[in-house]
Amino acid sequence: MQTILGIILLITFLAFIYYAARPRNLMLGLFVMALLWSGIGVLGGTVTWTDINTTIFDGGPTGFGPTAVYIIFGSWFGRILVETGIAGTIIRNAVELGGDKPGLTCILLNLVTALIFTTSYGPGAVVAIGVIVFPIMLSLGIPKPLAAGSFCMSVGCGLYFNQSLLNQAAGAMAIGEEKYAIGSEWYAFAAVAFAIHFLSIVIMVMLNMKKNKAHAWAAASVDTGKNVPAIAMLTPILPVLLAIVLKVSMIPGILLAVIFALVTTGNCKSWSKIADLVQKTFHDGVSDVGLVLGFLMFLQMFCKSAGMIKGLLAPILAPILPNSMFLMFLLFGLFSVLAMYRGPLTIWGAGMALFVIVAEATGWPLAVLYPLFYIPCCTINTNICPTQSWNMWAIGYTQVSVKDFMKTTLPFGLICAFILEMVAYVMFAM
């Protein structure tokens, strides 16, 4: 009986991969999967009514609370950078530094974007930066697929340090009550990953600019807002520096960075001005990630249900899963394309069930599993996949086809993912 139920679970898992790849509404898909797997778990004797009532559909979303707070604060911080003029000033300086070299200007804008998203988070922050960056890139004659692709890959480049996303992933990949702790070991890898990821962007820009000559004289004036003092431009990386050097937690780090931003940009002249700015940016920041939070809360229901039925799936899949860490990292690197369209290698989709199965079958620690699963999410899902909201926005804003966007970015994303899986094996599993 349990073998039959395990096969049914596997069929529903494959059906969900197909559903996610269409793409369809994932929030509803995750809810239906949680219902299905809970029901099958009841038949298999691994799930009780108490589990359904308390652990899956109540404990899943409510247990996500701390991570939701991190996401909201990351999104708010992104809005602070835009509203205070810090983001605009950094971008303007990058354009001036690039001079009459469109390719260099594109690379500098990508670097600025990557640094901003080491701390900022959310679709709203991406859009707010994108509406400044894209007109500059396009006015320089940079091809639209390259402008959209390099920008989206730059957003993903910063996410190796981004505590909003790192904590989001840690919450999703919890084993029981245990979560992966983001510490010095991860930050050492993040520095290497950032460098390799950004190098892939540079190579992508250089190769595409050779094929498509752009001219600096095509540049048009773009309003990026007021100038702020040079010291204020340290704000985007301040929370990361505080976390690495002084072990300051995410929320205090962001609060200190916000205070620093307000003081250095001259926004502390009156209490009412501070109140208006903080209130507006916080409201906008929460609005920006509302749907993201909804999706992630339904994902938690699915995660909890997957955890309850892992005993039915593990006996079927365990014999075919590699028991070698090197082979597992190698396979994830070779098949990272399966993170596309919420497939089996992204935890923000069908890959959540695979994580539960791999964790149960191998017994490997989170210190190994976390980088194994995070890399394809960060290099493929957040950078390139059209199901990621900000990627789809960039494609629409620049008016490029999904096909051209993918042709420009996917080869570099896949190579980057493979290299990073090999690096992660050396740093976390050897």
Task: Show the residue positions of the predicted features.
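N-terminal alpha-helical transmembrane segments of multi-pass membrane transport
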Residues: 1-73, 79-91, 95, 101-102, ...
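Membrane-core helix-loop-helix motifs of multi-pass transport proteins
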Residues: 134-228, 390-430
